[in-house]
Amino acid sequence: AALMTDTTVDIELVASCSEMKVNRVLTELYYDAMTQVPTPTYTPEELDFAKQITEEAGLINDGTLFSGLEPLEDEPVPIAIGTDASQVSHTVPLITLSAATMCKGTPLHHWAAAKQAGMTIGQKGMLYVARCMAEGTKLLMETPGSIEKAWELHKLTP
């Protein structure tokens, strides 16, 4: 329709977002913390709920929930989400953690995501990552020189 009506568009760039500046010092320290915190386990009722919700939503999944901890990657893994945390990461050393709060393959901003995140499946994931943040911060405070190393790396990373 735009072509048929000779519609034109003027684009004005008002702001832009930077990619996340990864700090390997913090990444390794907080990953160590994540290995020390037990990952969530799910009840038969939660697994049944997950299976039912994925069927209702028409998702390609049998209700499988992720359990465990992925190995730490050698290189940063791009994630397809928008966040202003990436801007913050260019000012101070920053770490972000995430955990499963819904079945594999559930699209974000989908009603099935909200329904899973709002029940015990989501609560367990959120509590897990909160414990990991607390444990990681404890390790950061207890590991001599870690804050200085994180800042040093931050200053060296473009």
Where are these regions (language model features)?
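Metal-dependent amide/peptide-bond hydrolase catalytic core
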Residues: 1-158
